[in-house]
């Protein structure tokens, strides 16, 4: 199947947005810089760099799955591949980070709140502990993958069902999905922030599914419509009188189309750089928050203005690259071993 180059571009861009935001926001949490000075670097009254990155990534996840599942879709192979690709790196990092925290604190009670029922470890096995914690339920979360991973795993679990209904009737499927989206959007009654809501993230996922299955390519002329929308959201001096959730969706779709229109240009290059970053993006995403959370507060004594901040970012990015590479290497070895073991068992 032909590789869609702008998928790589979007994946790299999304994770850069998310990591950049976390790098900056940790400066505030560590008392290095007031949030008022940082906010203009990643947000305004109409957009937020991290929420844009997350929204586009949910679209990208749906698009990638539906695009690769156009032909010879196997339910068992799908779940096996998703499980190995997502949960193996999560398990490895969770174990290593837990042992690291245990070595530091000398007690499990200093890592997790007391009184958590033992059965809730199942949320960790599913990779959904941080997402469940976001809803006020105590779990054994170490914040690896944050709420993002659990929400995405839920959508991966129901993807075959969504795909079935999408193929049955594209228009009816989209109308129902849009109806649910608008109902949730304009009658919002959830405790979680709107940009983290499962139904709104699910709608972005569905938009991506439909793009990946039916319309993965766009006429380059569409950029003359989409790019002005993106620029307007970034530069608009006043708050648009519409729902925050709607702003996120409109901007994410416009940003997607703008990137998609670059496909003819991207096809002319070899794409190795984007492809490499894209291949390691998930592992870097898993490790990045741990690195930022651990390194930034300890760098305070060495901060010397902007030069110190840039040096800190450089060190953290380098550590992300190294640890992300190691995590992927170890994960790939484990996945290969498990796949070989399964193949041997099937031959018996």
Predicted features, each with a name:
Residues 5-69, 86-94, 325:
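Functionally critical transmembrane alpha-helices in membrane proteins and complexes, commonly lining
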Residues 16-23, 128-132, 177-189, 228-241, ...:
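Aromatic-anchored segments of alpha-helical transmembrane domains
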Residues 37-45, 85-151, 184, 250-259:
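Membrane-interface helix-loop-helix regions
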Residues 331-348:
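Membrane-proximal cytoplasmic C-terminal regulatory module of class A 7TM GPCRs
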Residues 232-335:
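Alpha-helical transmembrane segments of multi-pass integral membrane proteins
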Residues 5, 41-54, 136-151, 187-207, ...:
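Interfacial loop-to-helix transition and helix-capping segments at the boundaries
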Residues 14, 47-56, 68-107, 111-127, ...:
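Transmembrane alpha-helical segments and their boundary/interface "anchor" motifs
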Residues 153-180, 209-227, 304:
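Solvent-exposed interhelical
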């Amino acid at each position: 199947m032909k590789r869609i180059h702008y998928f790589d571009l979007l994946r790299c861009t999304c994770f850069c947005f998310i990591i950049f935001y976390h790098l900056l926001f940790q400066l505030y949490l560590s008392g290095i810089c007031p949030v008022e000075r940082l906010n203009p670097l990643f947000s305004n009254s109409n957009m937020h760099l991290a929420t844009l990155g997350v929204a586009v990534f949910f679209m990208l996840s749906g698009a990638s799955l539906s695009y690769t599942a156009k032909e010879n879709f196997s339910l068992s192979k799908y779940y096996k591949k998703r499980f190995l690709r997502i949960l193996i790196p999560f398990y490895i990092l969770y174990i290593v980070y837990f042992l690291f925290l245990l070595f530091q604190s000398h007690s499990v009670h200093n890592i997790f709140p007391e009184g958590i029922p033992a059965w809730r470890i199942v949320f960790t096995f599913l990779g959904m502990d941080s997402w469940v914690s976001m809803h006020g339920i105590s779990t054994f979360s170490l914040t690896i993958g944050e709420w993002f991973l659990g929400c995405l795993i839920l959508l991966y679990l129901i993807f075959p069902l969504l795909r079935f209904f999408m193929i049955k009737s594209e228009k009816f499927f989209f109308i129902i999905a849009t109806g649910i989206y608008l109902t949730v959007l304009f009658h919002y009654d959830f405790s979680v922030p709107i940009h983290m809501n499962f139904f709104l993230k699910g709608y972005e996922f569905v938009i991506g599914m439909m793009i990946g299955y039916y319309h993965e390519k766009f006429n380059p002329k569409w950029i003359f419509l989409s790019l002005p929308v993106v620029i307007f959201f970034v530069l608009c001096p006043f708050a648009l009188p519409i729902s925050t959730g709607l702003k996120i969706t409109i901007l994410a779709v416009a940003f997607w189309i703008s990137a998609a229109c670059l496909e003819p240009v991207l096809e002319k290059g070899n794409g190795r750089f984007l492809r490499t970053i894209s291949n390691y993006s998930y592992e870097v995403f898993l490790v990045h928050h741990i690195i930022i959370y651990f390194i930034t507060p300890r760098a305070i004594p060495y901060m010397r203005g902007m030069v110190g901040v840039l040096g800190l970012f450089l060190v953290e990015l380098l550590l992300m690259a190294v640890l992300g590479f190691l995590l992927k290497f170890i994960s790939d070895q484990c996945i290969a071993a498990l796949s070989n073991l399964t193949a041997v068992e099937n031959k018996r």
